[in-house]
Amino acid sequence: MSPPSQLCLLTIVALILPSEGQTPEKPRSSFTAHQSSVTTHVPVPDQTSPGVQTTPPIWTSEAGEATGSQTAAKTKTQQLTEMATANPVTDPGPLTSSEKGTPALSRIKSPSPPKGYMPPSYIENPLDPNENSPFYYDNTTLRKRGLLVAAVLFITGIIILTSGKCRQFSQLCLNRHR
């Protein structure tokens, strides 16, 4: 194996394998199951389907009495139900909560923000005090810059190998063996 191909192979292996300190302590996945958060996708039918009805969330309470917060929550639920009748959706089934007096709809979370999104508070107040240092880089920044440098070196190597002088040098080597 020639030295340039060894260098390319070493660069690719170094970029693929995580370096020391970059291995996650817990395996990360894009889907995390949490019992208290449920995302339900409900298809919205067109206005031509006549049998579609909406149902308000089912409330659970031990004594059957509504407290002040439950009454306020029921009022909000009734307002939401009135708004939902203008835009009917299919019934996903009865939604009940294991907690006292809370609707199951409160457990539904909104979709997560995009991958590169950072809230403004994180940008203004970094979590690590070393982040203010000009010599501190997080792992993702180092990996991105490393990939950029590797790509530039790879393309530069290809340009050098395919330039006229390298072709002349290889012809000189071939002529020497004759």
UniProtKB/Swiss-Prot annotation:
Highest taxon above the source species: Eukaryota
Tissue: Spleen, lung, skeletal muscle, and testis.
Compositionally biased spans, kind Low complexity: 70-79
Cytoplasmic compartment residues: 165-178
Annotated localization: Cell membrane; Basolateral cell membrane
Biased composition (Polar residues): 29-58
Transmembrane spans: 147-164
Secretion signal span: 1-21
Keywords per UniProt: Cell membrane, Ion transport, Membrane, Potassium, Potassium transport, Signal, Sodium, Sodium transport, Sodium/potassium transport, Transmembrane, Transmembrane helix, Transport
InterPro entries listed in its UniProt record: FXYD_motif (IPR047297), Ion-transport_regulator_FXYD (IPR000272)
Membrane topology per record: Single-pass type I membrane protein
Post-translational modification: Glycosylated.
Ranges where the record places region Disordered: 21-126
Alphabetized GO MF terms: actin binding; cadherin binding; ion channel regulator activity; potassium channel regulator activity; sodium channel regulator activity
Example of a GO cellular component annotation carried by this entry: basolateral plasma membrane
Membrane topology (Extracellular): 22-146
Gene3D superfamilies linked to this entry: Single helix bin (1.20.5.780)
Subunit and partners: Regulatory subunit of the sodium/potassium-transporting ATPase which is composed of a catalytic alpha subunit, a non-catalytic beta subunit and an additional regulatory subunit. The regulatory subunit, a member of the FXYD protein family, modulates the enzymatic activity in a tissue- and isoform-specific way by changing affinities of the Na+/K+-ATPase toward Na(+), K(+) or ATP.
Physiological role: Associates with and regulates the activity of the sodium/potassium-transporting ATPase (NKA) which catalyzes the hydrolysis of ATP coupled with the exchange of Na(+) and K(+) ions across the plasma membrane. May increase NKA activity by increasing the apparent affinity for Na(+). Involved in down-regulation of E-cadherin which results in reduced cell adhesion. Promotes metastasis.
Record-given protein name: FXYD domain-containing ion transport regulator 5
Organism: Rattus norvegicus (Rat)
